[in-house]
């Protein structure tokens, strides 16, 4: 029985209790959210060491980190090092987007070592296996694709990105439009090439019930991918993007009817003033399904700093109702991220998520900031570092810039505003 079916039957599962504990909410609140589909708990029955987390309405905004090999860098050990960074940096989920090396072996090791939800994009592996075995990615059959989907699910993957909303009708609209970047989704581009070459409908759409049966078997959450997400600001919120979203909303209904949990993925590159509208349209068309956004990036001109452009957009998106942020690293649009890139990307997205949670009124969000303010007022450096979203970085900078442990920071020194004002207000801060 899936989490959704259990919730509808009135059962509060162990996973629901754990999510409630983490969120500081009642188990009944979580059960109701899962039952109606506004909350998902990705928790494959075969992911044995998972510490479940919930995404959705009324919960803290969550952060995903992407790792995985490429055709140029196939070392799974390096990706497992990234997984350690992902866990240490506090991400809530990780996606293995591997496209090189021993993909099955790497995925299984990531699942084995990950205590957070693991997601994948099965179509990557299906196309690559066909290229290697038959000499062409477009030699893939629908059976090939669903075999890989089941392989991922049976291994213990908690959620899968599937680009079900790209249909032949939608592609006709793309042809008529004047997009600058056309299709930037890797899975979306693979499917588009296959569909146009064969003149056939998207098997993930055409055989959606088959997909649901696999997810039902392992309690895998669907992450309905936005294969037509905008790849630049100029392409944002166009007809093709919205048409795909309409289809995804219809598929959310079908998944819920079957008892399969579903969330929806979103853009992408979006001008700041269009972000709220994108969230509101998704929440309406998809009937409150959790929204998982990539960024959104609010400008196209900042390669090397796209973790910042994504954090800006992610804050606005989450404050408007997005539930789950996919991190973007400084290496976005440039290359495979390093360990430090992964850490920076997670921290940028976590900052965005927390800033939005304050606006959302999430329990405990503002209190965290109040605790930091009190620690700063008291010049309590140990407490400030303890409360920092990245204590490791805060401690490092403090030690490097103030090795002698002076009470004030080296920015203000004897002219510390906290000390001066406290002196005249009769509220002398305690020495750290």
From Swiss-Prot:
Record-listed E.C. numbers: 4.1.99.17
Entry binding sites for substrate: 66, 95, 124, 163, 185-187, 226-229, 265, 292
Amino-acid positions noted as binding Zn(2+) in the UniProt annotation, renumbered to this chain: 269, 333
A molecular function (GO) term: zinc ion binding
GO annotation terms (biological process): thiamine biosynthetic process; thiamine diphosphate biosynthetic process
Co-factor requirement: [4Fe-4S] cluster
Pathway annotation: Cofactor biosynthesis; thiamine diphosphate biosynthesis
Cofactor binding comment, as recorded: Binds 1 [4Fe-4S] cluster per subunit. The cluster is coordinated with 3 cysteines and an exchangeable S-adenosyl-L-methionine.
Catalytic activity: 5-amino-1-(5-phospho-beta-D-ribosyl)imidazole + S-adenosyl-L-methionine = 4-amino-2-methyl-5-(phosphooxymethyl)pyrimidine + CO + 5'-deoxyadenosine + formate + L-methionine + 3 H(+)
Keywords for this protein: 4Fe-4S, Iron, Iron-sulfur, Lyase, Metal-binding, S-adenosyl-L-methionine, Thiamine biosynthesis, Zinc
Family: Belongs to the ThiC family.
Protein name: Phosphomethylpyrimidine synthase
Organism per entry: Desulforamulus reducens (strain ATCC BAA-1160 / DSM 100696 / MI-1)
Lineage, highest ranks first: Bacteria, Bacillati, Bacillota, Clostridia, Eubacteriales
């Amino acid at each position: 029985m899936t989490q959704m079916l259990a919730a509808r039957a009135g059962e509060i599962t162990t996973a629901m209790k754990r999510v409630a504990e983490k969120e500081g909410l009642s188990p009944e609140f979580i059960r109701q959210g899962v039952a109606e589909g506004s909350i998902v708990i990705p928790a494959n029955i075969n992911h044995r060491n998972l510490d479940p987390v919930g995404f959705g309405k009324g919960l803290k905004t969550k952060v995903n980190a992407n790792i995985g090999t490429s055709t140029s860098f196939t070392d799974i050990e390096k990706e497992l090092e990234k997984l350690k960074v992902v866990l240490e940096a506090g991400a809530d989920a990780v996606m293995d987007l591997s496209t090189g090396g021993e993909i099955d072996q790497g995925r299984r090791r990531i699942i084995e070592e990950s205590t957070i939800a693991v997601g994948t994009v099965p179509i990557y592996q299906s196309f690559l296996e066909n290229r290697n075995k038959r000499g062409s990615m477009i030699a893939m059959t629908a059976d090939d694709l669903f075999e890989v989907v089941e392989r991922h699910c049976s291994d213990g993957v908690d959620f899968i990105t599937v680009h079900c909303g790209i249909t032949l009708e939608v592609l006709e609209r793309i042809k008529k439009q004047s997009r600058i970047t056309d299709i930037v989704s890797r899975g979306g581009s693979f499917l588009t090439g296959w569909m146009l070459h064969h003149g056939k409908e998207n098997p993930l759409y055409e055989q959606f019930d088959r997909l649901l049966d696999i997810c039902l078997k392992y309690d895998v959450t669907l992450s309905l991918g936005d294969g037509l997400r905008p790849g630049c600001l100029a392409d944002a919120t166009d007809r093709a993007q919205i048409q795909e979203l309409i289809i995804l909303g219809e598929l959310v209904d079908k998944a819920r009817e079957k008892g399969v949990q579903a969330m929806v993925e979103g853009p992408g590159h979006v001008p700041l003033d269009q972000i709220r509208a994108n969230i509101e349209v998704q929440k309406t068309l998809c009937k409150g399904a959790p929204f998982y956004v990539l960024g959104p990036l609010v400008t196209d001109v900042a390669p090397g700093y796209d973790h910042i452009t994504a954090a800006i957009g992610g804050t606005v998106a989450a404050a408007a109702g997005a539930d789950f942020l996919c991190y973007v690293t400084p290496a976005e649009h440039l290359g495979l991220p390093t360990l430090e890139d992964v850490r920076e990307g997670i921290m940028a997205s976590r900052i965005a998520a927390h800033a939005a949670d304050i606006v959302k009124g999430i329990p405990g969000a503002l209190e965290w900031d109040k605790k930091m303010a009190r620690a700063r007022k008291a010049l309590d450096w140990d407490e400030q570092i303890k409360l920092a979203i990245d204590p490791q970085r805060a401690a490092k900078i403090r030690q490097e810039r103030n090795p002698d442990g002076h009470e004030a920071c080296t920015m203000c020194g004897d002219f510390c505003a906290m000390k001066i004002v406290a002196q005249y207000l009769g509220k002398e801060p305690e020495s750290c």
